[in-house]
Amino acid sequence: MSTYSIPYYNQMNGNYNNGMPQQTTAANQQAFPQQQQPTTTGNASQQQQQAAATAAAAAVQQPYNYMFYQQQGQPGQQTGQTAGQQQQQQQQQQQYDYNTYNRYQYPAATSQGNYYQQTIPNQLSQPQPQHYNGSNRNYTSAPSGAPIPSNSTSGPSQQPPLPGQQAVPIPPHVSTMQQPTPVQDTLNASSTSTVGQFQPPGIRPRVTTTMWEDEKTLCYQVDANNVSVVRRADNNMINGTKLLNVAQMTRGRRDGILKSEKVRHVVKIGSMHLKGVWIPFERALAMAQREQIVDMLYPLFVRDIKRVIQTGVTPNAAAATAAAAATATSASAPPPPPPPVAAATTTAATAISKSSSGNGNSISATSGGSNVSGASGAGSTTSPVNTKAATTAGTPQGNYYQTYNQQQYPQQYGQYNAPGKNQNTPASQPGSTTNDQYLQQQQQMYGYQSNYYQGGAANSSYYPNYYQQQQPNYASSYPYQQQQQKQQQQQPNQQQQSDQQQTSTPSGGAGTRSVHQSPQVQSLTQGSVHPSPQQHQANQSASTVAKEEK
């Protein structure tokens, strides 16, 4: 027989059903279902002749059984064998091929596991135990967690274990890296961040400033879910009872949480929104973050809440880090309670209305157009204020657009965008250094040829409309430009300009005849308009250029 047996050849073609040791007749029936083998028992030579005949007929019909034809089509070697000897020899052949196939399978499986272990970073390159059954010779029974070794105990890139795997205890220095970095404001009071809460989108700050007469301190009151939450200005403590009422918590759970607080101050007398258990700022912020009501209570948890009341804008992170060093020293000791007059100075942009009631004078101020009653009850009145109209020049809103034009734009664009600066800078004069620098920068940026801009920096004659708004004198001193104005806007043609320069006779100074000009530029005829000193200088330079051309 040949070196390839029938089941191994079928396995090479992907047919795994014939891998078990079988008799020759059964193998022939499964390999060739078209040909029916005789199942009658007879002598071996008769079966071999029939098998050879059917194999020859099948070889004509099916082109892929050449191995089977070569194996069964040699009757000279097999004529002396009985059926039992042939079956035993074939079983030995199959057993040999089956063992060699398993011998080849397991190194491939372990190399596959090592390949996955090498591709995953920070994994230990240990051999992975492969749970392959010997009967399954295909790769469909691969374990589901093959890319992740089950016995990996390595480094910070820990992956969550699969359901079938056992979680490995992580060393303590690694477990600290796994936890998300907590917000520092909830941990220590002297943290570097002084913001505490950023402005959520679409929400304007609504704060009412009241005076707590019994405690001689100022209070900041924010309403949410028809509950007024108050924060003291002297030690930044917050009414925890009202805070948890905003979260619509039950009374038993609320009291249980507040009783477990170590630092608390119980207030039993006073107005409705002042009664309750007062807790520190950090604990209140942690509770609000846990109950997800921080955005509803904006700007109660902004650390520098006075700036929010004055400007109406949360201080940004840059200003917060700059002010952190200044406030870190004062954060250790609580500031003294400010006098009632200080309320008017701190809330500069807000309207302060005093009203007499049972508690005495209560100062209530609303910021950002809110209309919320003050601490005294029904007797106090508040006045809505538009903070944008009330801001002074010292606040960031007053000179916002002015600084935007001065600082945000680069200096090279300032001569075209900021009209208030053109009278002071010599940028509008022809041949100045800023024009040359601007054109050089444009040539460096876009890789233009320098000779393409010849004369452009000198007299700006090729692009009159580009310089018209700040330099109207060119349009009047060179009247021949206006005839081809539309063509020059679309495509500056140097040949047309050279032809016009030959035909036209420019008279130096301002043009003596009227010119059809664009609506952006007033017509400058001689004696009609008193030109500015810049126009005088430009006219003189234009006349010198005209003389040089002559």
Curated annotation (Swiss-Prot):
Compositional bias segments (type: Low complexity): 342-383, 395-416, 476-502
Gene3D superfamilies noted in UniProt: Transcription regulator HTH, APSES-type DNA-binding domain (3.10.260.10)
Any single GO CC term annotated in Swiss-Prot or TrEMBL for this entry: chromatin
Source domain of life: Eukaryota
Biased composition regions of type Polar residues, renumbered to the chain: 123-153, 384-394, 420-435, 514-544
Record keyword Nucleotidyltransferase present: no
Chain's role: Transcriptional regulator of the switch between 2 heritable states, the white and opaque states. These 2 cell types differ in many characteristics, including cell structure, mating competence, and virulence. Each state is heritable for many generations, and switching between states occurs stochastically, at low frequency. Antagonizes the action of WOR1, WOR2 and CZF1, and promotes the white state. In white cells, EFG1 represses WOR1 indirectly through WOR2 to maintain white cell identity. Binds target gene promoters at the EFG1 recognition sequence (EGRbox) TATGCATA.
Name of the protein in question: Enhanced filamentous growth protein 1
Species this protein is from: Candida albicans (strain SC5314 / ATCC MYA-2876)
Annotated gene: EFG1
